[in-house]
Amino acid sequence: SKNVSAPGPGAASYSASKAALNQLMRVLAMEWGNDGIRLNTLHPNAVFDTGIWTDEILEARAKHYKLSVNEYKTNNVLKVEVNSIDVAELAAEMCGSLFAKTTAAQVPVDGGNDRVI
């Protein structure tokens, strides 16, 4: 979750739980590395094509930031909407040979969101 690197107000419990999972991943990467086990985390921004994001929630969040729904969904450096396929494709790629020598990495999938909010 992007809340590890860019937490927001009103999300203390959520942000703390995500940060704890991130730290656990880093420790396990050190402990299991000798066995060839790699652990990495992805930090997506909001993934809008999931059931969590109803029209009502999107409208409320956009209004909170004084943005249109489209502006809210693309409020990042690249001005792109992050969807579940984006996250899934990166997760699958990280299991392959391109990332075979990568462990304990924290990879954002957010279009640069933590740079604008």
Question: What positions do the PLM features span?
Answer:
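Active-site loop immediately N-terminal to the catalytic Tyr-X3-Lys motif
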Residues: 6-12, 79, 97
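Residue(s) in the substrate-gating loop at a strand-loop-helix junction
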Residues: 1
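C-terminal substrate-recognition "lid" of short-chain dehydrogenase/reductases
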Residues: 80-109, 114-115
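Active-site helix of classical SDR
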Residues: 17, 25
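Conserved SDR Rossmann-fold cofactor-binding beta-strand/turn motif
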Residues: 38-48, 108-110
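Short, small/polar-rich loop/turn modules that mediate ligand/substrate recognition or access, typified
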Residues: 33, 38, 102-104
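Catalytic tyrosine of NAD(P)H-dependent dehydrogenase/reductases that use a Tyr as the general acid/base
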Residues: 14, 22
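A glycine/serine/threonine-rich, flexible loop-to-helix segment
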Residues: 47-75
